[in-house]
């Protein structure tokens, strides 16, 4: 079994290589630092890797505000609004918003299930990941995923239906970067018009706007792609195991090779 690195030296290395160098996302220096009360409040609740990132950057934005580390206490009303009345495929637990995008996509961390829930407030969709939740029993994976929550950041991917450009890029050019307590929001909201046009965007108060979106539309649970991938892997393993006893070793290998070729063509 491979021993995966997970200590704070690895966390710092991943910050440098994945976030600052590969993504090229420099911190804006526009947020605020994390006080000792936050570290004390979340010590033992969140991985040490998360607390390290907090101490390293504070609640700051990156790449002209495309991505923000969030204060989970400030963002608690938004989380509550989106989870209210929503049946999740996880045990009951407290969820915290650890980061978000310029347009309000949020990555939530469950105290039991970890980074197993993303929220898309524009489409009204919550995306679960049972695969991530399953890793939380492993201390090493918990620490690594705490780091990856920030070094593999969420990105706004909506395209302007007229220009074909990323909506967030057009918004930054026209409106400037959003601040710590701001998001870009459509007026009227997308859930009312279905129009994805950057010209309809304005700068909104983040908490008020995202709570409004939670109350203005039905919430839907998106497909858990991690569960689907696990089912496919299990089915492949079952199929491979079922074929080999049927004939000679050569026949079994040939059949397995054909199956692998078909699978590669499909995926």
Which sequence ranges carry the predicted segments?
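Intrinsically disordered, low-complexity segments
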Residues: 237-267
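A surface-exposed partner-binding patch
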Residues: 1-117, 172-239
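Alpha-helical bundle/repeat cores within regulatory domains of eukaryotic proteins
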Residues: 159, 166, 175-177
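Compact, glycine/acidic-enriched structural inserts
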Residues: 117-159
């Amino acid at each position: 079994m491979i021993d995966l690195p997970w200590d704070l030296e690895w966390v710092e290395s991943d910050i440098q290589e994945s976030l600052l160098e590969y993504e090229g996302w420099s911190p804006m220096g526009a947020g605020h630092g994390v006080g000792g009360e936050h570290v004390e409040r979340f010590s033992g609740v969140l991985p040490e890797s998360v607390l390290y990132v907090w101490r390293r950057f504070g609640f700051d934005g990156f790449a002209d505000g495309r991505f923000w580390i969030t204060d989970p206490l400030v963002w608690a009303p938004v989380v509550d609004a989106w989870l209210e009345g929503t049946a999740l495929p996880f045990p009951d637990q407290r969820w915290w918003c650890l980061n978000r995008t310029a347009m309000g996509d949020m990555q939530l961390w469950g105290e039991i299930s970890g980074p197993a829930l993303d929220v898309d407030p524009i489409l009204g969709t919550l995306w679960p990941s049972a695969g991530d939740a399953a890793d939380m029993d492993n201390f090493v994976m918990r620490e690594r995923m705490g780091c990856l929550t920030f070094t593999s950041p969420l990105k706004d991917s909506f395209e302007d239906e007229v220009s074909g450009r990323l909506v967030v890029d057009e918004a930054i050019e026209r409106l400037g970067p959003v601040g710590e307590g701001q998001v870009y929001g459509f007026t009227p909201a997308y859930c009312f018009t279905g129009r994805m046009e950057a010209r309809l965007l304005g700068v909104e108060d983040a908490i008020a706007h995202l709570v409004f979106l939670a109350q203005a539309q039905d919430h839907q649970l998106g497909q858990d792609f991690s569960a689907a991938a696990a089912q496919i892997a299990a089915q492949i393993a079952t199929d491979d195991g079922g074929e080999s006893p049927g004939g000679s070793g050569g026949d079994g290998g040939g059949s397995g090779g054909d199956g692998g070729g078909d699978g590669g063509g499909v995926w």
